[in-house]
């Protein structure tokens, strides 16, 4: 694992840190990315080393290069790291799955790739013709936007106006068209607007992250196996946010199949605890409630404070949902019955995406008031 963190480009290599001269990259002939140095196989398409020949002006295989064919080849295989300081009082170990290290810094990079690829394989969409439409709170939109940009799709996203400014800027940077909706209506309002755009736009296709089976499927095929292999099957408990239902359902189902005794714990906001009979909302179609053994509610204030402490104590700059997942994992790790167990927790997104949000409000205000020393 250290080799991936310290040398991410050479970690794509077959099994050495330096490719041998005159050696054809073995990744080229495989059906998925293989990381022999960490004994890992992940179900993304194979890497093909290509370049344009100056003489023939046609794609030519180049020997010995460890270069991804395109940005989608960089999705997945995110590292895990133990939490060491914030876990005071815990009797179980907690290892965080750092989805913040995806190409666009969130777990939604996986489903952006999966949903677009799945629709292409089924002949439902094609670049340059289809207009992709999707409601999003931000991160799924970004996961779709960078892939849409790399493949030549026009993308229209609807998003509650309450989402952070950073997300809007990033989406526009990738060329996505952004339509803001009434924040009081939450994601329901964004979904309604997306359906309206779909009905009024020729050749439009809505990806439906909340109901698209390609969402949990990618987690079943990649996230689950990655956690299982990185923990050598020693994982006892998985803690993950509920969100669209994809991460916890797909990952949880895979882990349960490997070991039915693994506990799957979902995390949802106290302010919108639809699974616990709280305020109105909607339960996503992708959520497999049978996979979950327990649901823990975390308030927004608790999530924000925990995210701050992860930066200060662990050096991990994460988003609010990661703070919620971390606190839930810490609560579970303090239970006497979990002594000596291994808890894996998914950190879904990077903190830099929340600079304009309440997460960094006090720091932002402090920085805005700073004056130069003369």
Curated annotation (Swiss-Prot):
Pyridoxal 5'-phosphate binds at residues 139, 243-247, 321. Its cofactor is pyridoxal 5'-phosphate. InterPro entries: Cys_synth, Cys_Synth/Cystath_Beta-Synth, CysK, P-phosphate_BS, TrpB-like_PALP, TrpB-like_PALP_sf. It is found in: Plastid, Chloroplast stroma; Plastid, Chromoplast. The modification N6-(pyridoxal phosphate)lysine is found at residue 108. It comes from Capsicum annuum. The keyword Amino-acid biosynthesis applies. GO terms for molecular function: cysteine synthase activity. Pathway: Amino-acid biosynthesis; L-cysteine biosynthesis; L-cysteine from L-serine: step 2/2. Residues 1-50 form a transit peptide. Its EC number is 2.5.1.47. One of its GO terms (biological process) is cysteine biosynthetic process from serine. Pfam families: PALP. The keyword Nucleotidyltransferase does not apply. Belongs to the cysteine synthase/cystathionine beta-synthase family. It catalyses: O-acetyl-L-serine + hydrogen sulfide = L-cysteine + acetate. PANTHER family: CYSTATHIONINE BETA-SYNTHASE. GO terms for cellular component: chloroplast stroma; chromoplast. It comes from the Eukaryota. This is Cysteine synthase, chloroplastic/chromoplastic. Keywords: Amino-acid biosynthesis, Chloroplast, Chromoplast, Cysteine biosynthesis, Plastid, Pyridoxal phosphate, Transferase, Transit peptide. Homodimer.
């Amino acid at each position: 694992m250290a080799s991936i963190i310290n040398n991410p480009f050479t970690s794509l290599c077959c099994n050495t840190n330096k490719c041998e001269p005159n050696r054809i990259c073995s990744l080229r002939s495989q059906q998925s990315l293989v990381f022999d140095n960490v004994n890992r196989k992940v179900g993304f398409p194979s890497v093909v080393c290509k370049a344009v020949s100056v003489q023939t002006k046609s794609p030519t295989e180049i020997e010995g290069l460890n270069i991804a064919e395109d940005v989608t080849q960089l999705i997945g295989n995110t590292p895990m790291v133990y939490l060491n300081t914030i876990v005071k009082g815990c009797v179980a170990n907690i290892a965080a799955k750092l989805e913040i290290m995806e190409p666009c810094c969130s777990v939604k990079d996986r489903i952006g790739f999966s949903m677009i690829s799945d629709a292409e394989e089924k002949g439902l969409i094609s670049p340059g013709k289809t207009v992709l439409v999707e409601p999003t709170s931000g991160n799924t939109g970004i996961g779709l936007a960078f892939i849409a940009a790399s493949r030549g799709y026009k993308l229209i996203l609807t998003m509650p106006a309450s989402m952070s400014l950073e997300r809007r800027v990033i989406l526009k940077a990738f060329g996505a068209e952004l339509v803001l909706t009434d924040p009081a209506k939450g994601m329901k309002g964004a979904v309604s607007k997306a359906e309206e755009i779909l009905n009024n736009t020729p050749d439009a296709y809505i990806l439906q992250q909340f109901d698209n089976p390609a969402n949990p499927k990618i987690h079943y095929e990649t996230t689950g196996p990655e956690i299982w292999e990185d923990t050598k099957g020693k994982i006892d408990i998985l803690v993950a946010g509920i969100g669209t239902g994809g991460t916890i359902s797909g990952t949880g189902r895979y882990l349960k199949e490997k070991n039915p005794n693994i506990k799957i714990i979902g995390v949802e906001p106290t302010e919108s605890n639809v699974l616990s009979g709280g305020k109105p909302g909607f339960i996503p179609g992708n959520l497999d409630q049978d996979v979950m053994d327990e649901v823990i509610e975390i308030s927004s204030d608790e999530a924000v404070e925990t995210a701050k402490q992860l930066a200060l104590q662990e050096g991990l700059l994460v988003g609010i949902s990661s703070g919620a997942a971390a606190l839930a994992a810490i609560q579970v790790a303090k239970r006497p019955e979990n002594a000596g167990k291994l808890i894996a927790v998914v950190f879904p997104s990077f903190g830099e995406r929340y600079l304009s949000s309440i997460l960094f409000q006090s720091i932002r205000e402090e920085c805005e008031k700073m004056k130069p020393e003369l």
